[in-house]
Amino acid sequence: MGHFTEEDKATITSLWGKLNVEDAGGETLGRLLLVYPWTQRFFDSFGNLSSASAIMGNPKVKAHGKKVLTSLGDAVKNLDDLKGTFAQLSELHCDKLHVDPENFRLLGNVLVTVLAIHFGKEFTPEVQASWQKMVTGVASALSSRYH
């Protein structure tokens, strides 16, 4: 899953503290649903997902995106135990929701894109490397209970 250096931890925590979870969460999930339209099948109850404006303006997309990013806050606090942190969510997504674990990797990559957009020059290659390590670790942790 990758070892997080003290510098990685400081970089991740610092940027996380500046992030508007609600805005970034909605944008991240919205972009996932738009860029990878097959992921929409997991969100049948969200209503109209027929266009970019429908997806990005959908209150259920925004609310669930906030929920997803809020749970990512648990990762920021528990970088040394991502597998344990996400054990229950991994079981839920495997056994009940039947989500393809590849989607976790895609979501992480979309989040990195959103962070780059939101933070601009502050999102240096070093910051990106730390965040990429984290989202890869989270995707791996969320996939850990699949069988």
Swiss-Prot record:
GO biological process terms on file: hydrogen peroxide catabolic process
Binding site for heme b: H64, H93
Residues modified as Phosphothreonine: T13
Chain positions found as Phosphoserine: S45, S51, S53, S140, S143, S144
Residues annotated as domain Globin: 3-147
Positions of post-translational N6-acetyllysine modification: K60, K83
PTM sites of type S-nitrosocysteine: C94
Assigned GO CC terms: blood microparticle; haptoglobin-hemoglobin complex; hemoglobin complex
Reported tissue expression: Red blood cells.
A Pfam match: Globin
CDD domains recorded: Hb-beta-like (cd08925)
Keywords annotated in UniProt: Acetylation, Heme, Iron, Metal-binding, Oxygen transport, Phosphoprotein, S-nitrosylation, Transport
Keyword DNA-binding belongs to the record: no
Sample GO molecular function, one term: heme binding
Entry's family note: Belongs to the globin family.
Known function: Gamma chains make up the fetal hemoglobin F, in combination with alpha chains.
Subunit structure: Heterotetramer of two alpha chains and two gamma chains in fetal hemoglobin (Hb F).
Protein name: Hemoglobin subunit gamma-2
Provenance organism: Pongo pygmaeus
